[in-house]
Amino acid sequence: SLDRLMGQNYIGRTGDTYNFLTDEEQDIQKEINLTQVDTGAIVGDIAKIIFGMIYDAKKFRYGKCDFPFDQMVDNTMYGIATGGMRLRFLTAASDATEKTEFRLMNSSKGSEAIVVLGDTPYYESLEASMKIRKYVKQRNVSQMPKSAQDIIRGQQEEAAKYEAEASKALVEAIENAKFYADGEHLDIKSGNAKAKIDQTMEYLVSHVYSKLDLIGKNADTDAEIMAVLSGADVVFAEADPNRDAEAAVEEYLEMQAMKHLPTSMADVQSKLSSIP
């Protein structure tokens, strides 16, 4: 088969075309195949593609609010941790024990969304690309014979194609993924990769910040806030769209008073804007 011949370095691939290799090409191909690349580096590149190209939002907008979230691939954090909600992708490199239904539902309970990537060749494509890049970096290519330089130039072009294939395969892997949030396996059938992640995050936010729906009307400007604080915006209790939210604030203040604890506006904001 073609895979067996490639594994034995008898043939090479250029795009969708396979060619028999010369002795020199076989030697270089063999050295590339024997080049070791770190799993963590591959996972890091997966994270760059997912969070840098496919889903590059740093915050998720729900209604009129923006919610920051931590970005992870397997057990590797991407970017700066916020300590709040988390969006995590599990790749082909993750341990199989992490992908059992029980483990996924248990791990996502609380404030995490987990996306178990579908079975596409994104990992193999990135690994092949990284082997070529590392091999070239370790060689003094300019001092090699022209024939070898030409071969390596072709390999570098192939590496770029592998990277493009990996990006496309990752999109497909998300579209065919399994989605979990707050302890539930979500049934998300429609939408592209970004839309499916959005649906997962929407479910997570609505369950983590379970009191968001208490707010019936947002104050969008400083003038609206001042009108409320000064009493200029008078609304009867029965018609107050925020009466449930106000009751939650009052309950918190009463509990603080019972404990004889001083409470600042910053305390109120911290309490009511953090994860319950």
What annotation goes with each model-predicted range?
Residues 1-276:
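Extended alpha-helical interface modules used as scaffolds for assembling large macromolecular complexes
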